[in-house]
Design a protein with these regions (language model features):
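Conserved beta-strand-loop-alpha-helix junction that forms the acyl-donor binding cleft
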Residues: 88, 114-124, 143
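Acetyl-CoA-dependent GNAT
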Residues: 8, 30-86, 97-98, 103, ...
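A short beta-loop-alpha structural element at the N-terminal edge
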Residues: 2-14
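Conserved acetyl-CoA-binding loop-helix of GNAT-fold acetyltransferases
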Residues: 89-104, 126-130
């Protein structure tokens, strides 16, 4: 599998993955009827870098990296990931996670925070814990899961390097 920076030309391959992931109503807070234009803005908006993972020349997943907050909080990164449901379990998510951590370090971020990991998304929670993330907060009944009703969401965090207190 190869990971590279996404281009506008990749969006035609990214759109069906986005649609398939949000259609389940189990992992992302997007309305299943989210428009193509809104999805495009999510992946190619200002202040973010998007990447795709390809297998055999076909896009099978994507992630985006950005600052979690502006100005005095901009040293903490945030990222979002989607894998084509037909390729879940293939290692694409792990490969993108590792790539993203390295890209975040390279960009000068000191930590990474995921603001909203659905607690029942066991594969994602397991992956992020394996990559060094810790649950640092629980948002009670913050996600309206299509099958399970209201479930918790996690805030997950990890440092990207040892952080020294200033001066």
């Amino acid at each position: 599998m190869d990971i590279r920076r996404a281009t506008e030309g990749d969006f035609d391959a990214m759109w069906p993955i986005f649609q398939a992931v949000i259609a389940s109503g189990t992992t992302y807070s997007f309305d299943p009827g989210t428009s193509r234009a809104d999805a495009h803005a999510y992946w190619f908006g200002p202040g973010l870098s998007s990447y795709v993972i390809e297998e055999g020349g076909r896009v099978v997943g994507m992630y985006k990296l950005r600052a979690n907050q502006r100005d005095l909080g901009a040293h903490v990164a945030n990222a979002s990931f989607m894998v084509d449901p037909a390729h879940q379990g293939s290692g694409a998510g792990r490969a993108m996670g590792l790539h993203c951590l390295e890209e975040a370090r390279r960009a000068g971020f000191l930590a990474m925070q995921f603001n909203f990991v659905v607690s029942t998304n066991e594969a994602a929670v397991r992956l992020w814990k394996a990559l060094g993330f810790k649950v640092v907060g629980v948002l009670p009944r913050a996600f309206r899961h299509r099958q399970l009703g209201y479930v918790d969401a996690y805030v997950m965090h990890r440092f990207l390097e040892d952080v020294q207190a200033p001066g």
